[in-house]
Amino acid sequence: MASATAPAAAAPTLAPPLQQLRHLAEELRLLLPRVRVGEAQETTEEFNREMFWRRLNEAAVTVSREATTLTTVFSQLPLPSPQETQKFCEQVHAAIKAFIAVYYLLPKDQGITLRKLVRGATLDIVDGMAQLMEVLSITPTQSPENNDLISYNSVWVACQQMPQIPRDNKAAALLMLTKNVDFVKDAHEEMERAVEECDPYSGLLNDTDENNSDNHNDEDDVLGFPSNQDLYWSEDDQELIIPCLALVRASKACLKKIRILVAENGKKDQVAQLDDIVDISDEISPSVDDLALSIYPPMCHLTVRINSAKLVSVLKKALMSAFKMELECLLD
């Protein structure tokens, strides 16, 4: 006769510790797309800036602490039991989700530029923790290579940088403008160096002309290797490069001028205006890159002129936006 008492359900079997870490890494990576497109949490409460940043910093400290704890227990033998590993993984997952939840508390009206910076920091922390899980799941746990990866893991760097994030949209805008100035400065210096050396591909190709016969050079052309006209500027090319350099130099000066206008006249409550200035200024660096790349041989003069006109248009929009903000400040 069958027993009237049903057998107790068997406890679910936990995966091995390293497999649990790999699974957690996958779960964390699934959070990344949601953070990229996630909107700010709707609330009727007035935004408290000091409380938000305090909570965000505290959440970052918690994430860093959980990362350190997990690294300590998985960098030595014996490994934790499956039950202990489950607990560690749950704590890490909870710390990451708590950090993301705090990020969602930053409303849009505090500035799109500021939200982008905080979102970027959030993505760095989540991705850094996922990387850490993947590294810890590699065996043997005490290999020198593994320890090097762990010691330089980005999750701690991202958490430590949290207090350096700008606290308002004006500070965020100034940071982004400074980065754009640096990008354009680097592009200008690279262009100037190539022009001064009259060798746009200096260091990229070995000069072995003395070892190649005429027949060998003909063979290279057939095989698709660049000929001299593909590697060096013609006289017409060099004449066109001069105004291009001047335009990139003007772009750098323009960004510096905009940064000064924002620093001296921008107000923290001019959120939309600051966002507009940053959005337009963000177009300058890619436009400079397009122009810089188009001057390398073999040069298409039409492409260079199109990219130059595009950059001029972007510069005009950026300056108009900055001067508009300055005018509003003067009229207030």
UniProtKB/Swiss-Prot annotation:
It is found in: Cytoplasm; Nucleus. The modification N-acetylalanine is found at A2. Keywords: Acetylation, Cell cycle, Cytoplasm, Nucleus, Phosphoprotein. Residues 2-208 are annotated as: Required for interaction with CCND1. Phosphorylated. It comes from the Eukaryota. InterPro entries: GCIP-like, GCIP-like_N, GCIP_C. The keyword Acetylation applies. Residues 2-190, 240-332 are annotated as: Interaction with RPLP0. Pfam families: GCIP_C (PF20936), GCIP_N (PF13324). One of its GO terms (cellular component) is cytoplasm. Residues 2-184, 150-332 are annotated as: Interaction with TCF3. Interacts with CCND1 and GRAP2. May also interact with COPS5, RPLP0, SIRT6, SYF2 and TCF3. Belongs to the CCNDBP1 family. May negatively regulate cell cycle progression. May act at least in part via inhibition of the cyclin-D1/CDK4 complex, thereby preventing phosphorylation of RB1 and blocking E2F-dependent transcription. This is Cyclin-D1-binding protein 1. The gene is CCNDBP1.
